[in-house]
Amino acid sequence: MSKMPPSYTSTTNACKLCKPLGASLAFRGIEGAVPFLHGSQGCATYMRRYIISHFNEPIDIASSSLGEKHAVYGGSANLKLGLNNVTKKYNPQLIGVATTCLTETIGDDVKRIISEYKAEFYNGEKPCKGEKSFELGKSFKLEKSEIDKVSKRDPYIISVSTPSYSGTHIEGFHAAIKAVVEQLTEPAGLINEIHASPDDIHTLEDTFPVTALTRESVNFMPGFVSAADLRYLKEVLTDFGISFTLFPDYSESLDGEALNDYPLIPSGGTPIENIKKMGWAKITIECGSTLPKESAGTALAQMYGTPLYRTSLPIGIRETDKLMDKLEEISKREIPARYRSARGRLVDAMVDGHKYLSGKRAIVYGEEDLVVGLTSFLAEIGIKPIICASGGKSGQLNQAIANVVEGLAPLPQVYEDVDFYDIEERAESLDIDILVGHSKGYAFSRKKGVPLIRVGFPIHDRIGGQRILHLGYHGAQMLFDAITNTIIAKKQDDSPIGYSYM
């Protein structure tokens, strides 16, 4: 009798996004950068559509536009041609190249291809000797008309491996940040002022001494948060009088002002010169409870000895208190009065709204670090998290959730690497009052008949997802009001009487 194959159910309504999307978002947080996907045109189109739908901002993501023949013969020539085109048309300071499933599967050596491209193209002195395309084993060279001099200031090119089958968008986001740190930061003492010389050799005349940010600045890497969160963090650090490098910073490049003319590369982003000096900061603060062991912060610590402090996302009172205490220690200043007052108002609001929230039950889903932060906050305000779920699979979620609910709420059911089919199946017999997560849970919310509190990414069915503030006392206040009013509205709508006073 033959052995039956194991039963298998494909992913149904995934609770995660693909790895190159996260890398594209991270690269967009660098000043003058253009994200570039080495793969098929469809990958870049999908990323653009998804990001635009949430941020309501245009975003260009370049592509090497591989087709069927490149899956057989390789995409080297397309990558080189694409890099040259982006450099000529956009004049970027940096190009962030992220791989896709296709190029990882066929085995393209992206680092080698980029190295060849620099030798062939940079400073416009050497024509590209790479193969333009391949057909039946026959090679074709680039025509002279296709070879133009690139920018006078050749862009940095950062590469990162991000096949979708190896992780989620959050892993791609962190992988891109780590790649930038490893490939762009430079030793203290002398920092290169130019990008490349003809022989890629720098002399003392090409450099300048590190001064302004050396051992005085703080590296702050908050992870994947909203544009409003990034602006808030910059305000906090400024109010503490701290010189800082916030990386990545897409608070303006993905949530900018209305302009008369469309810029090819929007303003905003972490300045490249600041990134180059990150290894010589006073300390690195990295936010996240489920970060990879090998992160950008650990890379800086290993490469330059930069002290690393890790903390959870500052959502709610306890986690924000931890961050404020650390900033007090670093700045040697007391917490500014505006944040002390905001904390007091939040506590007062929690007392006022406790009668509406006590004992309510919630399902929280989304990115692992956000789920941990939201679970901590819900436990603080008297709501019992029943299920905490994520499409990520760091292996750290269960312990992180246990840490934040200890002493406040029973340990919820915690699930990693799940989709919405799994979440619905586990929640079928449970009595819940609210869902907390992104828009992809709306179908479940409608089916279950419970309201959805929209947070995180993506938010496609409401406007202003990029402006939702989650962090700090101010963010907690906004979340508290939204949750409380949603529960009141649900009770009001369900009442046959229609009370106007609750």
Q: What annotation goes with each model-predicted range?
A:
Residues 1-502:
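An N-terminal assembly and electron-transfer interface module characteristic of large anaerobic redox
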